């Protein structure tokens, strides 16, 4: 009779921490965001809905009204996301090849090997791809960066975010390794002051324009993207481990098995999309449509692609159910 080992929350947490140590994306997003799972693959994200300020009016009689203006009940926005990635492992340890006892320690060693070589690279590449694709700002560069142009290009992209109200010093600059050399060789980078006692996420190489600089293997970075800037609250990467267990004396073989399953995904928050910005090759950016309104009729013109629109002011890129 096979014996199943179910690994507790403490062991799962230790593996999650191990994943985060070397992940290039785990430090970039907010892990404490207000999220609620519905079933195994739907997650709801809640955010306080803010309104415009009132004008204090001293001429209002307090017995008949409020000098503070209209009373508005505090509400929230709820965003619903569907987890599309459902990955699994089913690995066997044949008794003829295994002299060690199969237990939590053995399972942990196997899982750490898979985290290093398979799971972490896959998740990092997927997250970067989704965040870059769904970013609120895409800037096309006329030519690939060089050591004489990259500094100005990074500052211009960062300024575009700040102009949209994004916090100045809360972002991470992701840059492909094949472009990092141009930043490091730029005169402005060479002349930067020492970071002193600042603590930076492991694997980062410094700060520039208030941004933590995170190099990424060119193989993990999306094609036609040179660099990207992400602010923590603008990107999320929800996940849920559904199964993690060891099976001793498996009925299907003379040995033991380790089974793992995880559902996950990555998204850009619709109302904070300006906190995700990407510098791309010109060929990778869709031209912005033009809208002309005359006599109550809107005419939309676009050079390419399919144009989606909404009637309530929401962004059709993220709320596809309401887009037309």
Residue ranges and their predicted role:
Residues 95-164:
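Alpha-helical scaffold segments that mediate packing/assembly in large oligomeric complexes
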Residues 242-289:
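Extended, compositionally biased alpha-helical segments that mediate assembly or anchoring
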Residues 70-109:
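Long, hydrophobic/aromatic-enriched structural stretches that serve as scaffold segments
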Residues 282-324:
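Short, compositionally stereotyped local motifs that mark structural "simplifiers"
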Residues 57-60, 190-193, 314-324:
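Acidic Ser/Thr/Pro-rich low-complexity disordered segments
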Residues 1-81:
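N-terminal "assembly arms/tails" that initiate or stabilize quaternary assembly
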Residues 53-56, 91-92, 182-185, 269:
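Short helix/loop capping segments that flank catalytic or ligand/cofactor-binding pockets
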Residues 39, 44, 161-246:
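Extended oligomerization regions of viral-like shell subunits
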